[in-house]
Amino acid sequence: MATYCDEPVDSYFYSSYNPYMGRYPRHRDAGWKYKSYLSHYGDTSEAFSNQQRAQLKSILSQINPKLTPRLRKANTKDVAVQVNPKRDASVQCSIGPRTLLVVKRELRRRRKLNPGPPGTPQKTEGEVRYPRTLAVYSPIAFRSVTSFLVETGKDRPAAEAQAEELPGEQPEQKGGENQAGEETNANLPEQRKPQSEDAQTAADAEGSKGKARVRFQFLEQKYGYYHCRECNLRWESAYVWCVQGTNKVYFKQFCRKCQKDFNPYRVEDITCHVCNKARCACAETQRHVDPKRPHRQDLCGRCKGKRLSCDSTFSFKYIV
């Protein structure tokens, strides 16, 4: 081999053919490990596939908004929390349109296989409304309480009431039509009016008795007096939760010694005894009940760690 300045020239020349060029990776040893910052974040191919999918979706949406890439099976790594689409459709997480579309397809297929009786209205998924949670002390709550009423007996239309109340009169009327002719047909609407009005008023009276009941009840804060006979201990508390408009106590309180639960033997509104106001407006301030500062601070330690503790102030509370 020729030499240049007494040095071999082999080290300066390389073969024009590299067997490891192209897409085939070079052979590595068994103990070799590629170190990269992307190794801590899962498979890089998955990340690139998601990026390519997003780019493809944006390109297709620019061409035609109806064109979207084929939906693949949802991956739990990308999705995080999944809920049951059949039961919890109202609280669907942002997992894409696949689950809801599948539910709609199943509903359409079931409706086609099992059509209802003729004349029944078909409900759509878009008509379902889920009311928001409202606070007790919010002014919106008292205005929209009627929206949570469940109607047990809905008002029936006059046509249905006539059909139910007058089933036996139809053959008699038919016989009268055959006998009397057109004159009786002209007088029939006048005879039906008072009967239909009586039937409608009777149905309204029955429906008004058990018309509706509230789905959940609001709670209000009151003042209560407690007495434990075993420990011979009395205490007062301004954290007595009662059903709104009544003295029905919903949560019991515990004695600080024996830890037994008790209902108050007396409950009163959190107001001044003289002016009957929540904020006392008397010239000489008498005993006033403040919800945030009960009278006996030494007795409030009995409720620590309980569900309703005096340490925390609740802005609202309701029973579902």
UniProtKB/Swiss-Prot annotation:
Question: Which Pfam family is one of this chain's hits?
Answer: Zn_ribbon_3CxxC
Does this entry carry the keyword Transport?
no
- What does the entry give for GO biological process? negative regulation of translation; oogenesis; translation
Keywords of the record: Cytoplasm, Developmental protein, Differentiation, Metal-binding, Oogenesis, RNA-binding, Zinc, Zinc-finger
Q: Does the keyword Zinc apply?
A: yes
Please name the GO terms that the record assigns under molecular function. Answer: mRNA binding; zinc ion binding
Its biological purpose: mRNA-binding protein required for maternal mRNA storage, translation and degradation during oocyte maturation. Probably promotes formation of some phase-separated membraneless compartment that stores maternal mRNAs in oocytes: acts by undergoing liquid-liquid phase separation upon binding to maternal mRNAs. Binds to the 3'-UTR of maternal mRNAs, inhibiting their translation.
Q: What is this protein called?
A: Zygote arrest protein 1
Q: What gene name is given for the protein in this entry?
A: zar1
